[in-house]
């Protein structure tokens, strides 16, 4: 299994508005675009995210400072607001904010590469409109491959490769409501998912015919899985590089009604001890090795995560090794950038909403 990676970063400085005709060198431009999953579903260059997605991006746009390097910059809606919003968290975690830039400055930056939360048509169109060189942006063909790999079909295709003693899991792609009804009759209770959707959305725990027909009409199919009695959520975070797939760490996270709410911040050893209460660590290692060796992501380069879960089986627990593949950066990657070195120190990272989104870190009680 690959080694745990926790990118504590160097000190950066806030970038003041650029003077005209003065290029500021930026090694990597980071972008938090959490509406990415919905943008994939729309597949439109002129996509407008729902209000909640736009607000999440605006309120937490500073997040990449947690893993950015000294020569990097983070694209935000408002530079001053982003600098204020991240001050308390950065002080608490011993990090100094990196430089922030807004759209008006993009044409004045000498950018080496761009690392968004996830690539889609809408993001590329926005960057191009604001003066970013086309050579830094993915082609139509690359974006289409990313979109197809982000289809939940990819998870269903990987799942059989991860099956071994102690695991469970099936998933089927259906293109008609009749196929869904047949699976419902076979399994009794099923989960129906849209091929592309954001966290907590596009997932139904029934086979509502009208909803299924609508998703099939818009996205071409739905994914259907047997319902499993979940005990806990977790995931594995990876990075796809030119030399292969690298394991970055475990992600122990919490959800409410399918929507992400927070992560445990702990060392890999502490997280493995927690997971060992449910499933064999040898099984986790074997599944991780299969992902590294057998998952084919074509020419995709960047972070991605596999959502998994522990479920109740006959007389014990079973591992579902691939609930979903997120072909983008995830909150699990964010948690890894904040994880401690001390096995005794365990924190909780949470996202809450009270008129605005906030990310907080507190000690676990």
Please give the residue ranges for each predicted region:
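Conserved N-proximal alpha/beta basic substrate-recognition cap immediately N-terminal to
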Residues: 54-69, 75-182
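Short, positively charged and aromatic/hydrophobic N-terminal segments
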Residues: 10-14, 19-20
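Glycine-rich phosphate-binding loop of ATP-grasp-fold ATP-dependent ligases
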Residues: 170-173, 189-211, 232-235, 258-274
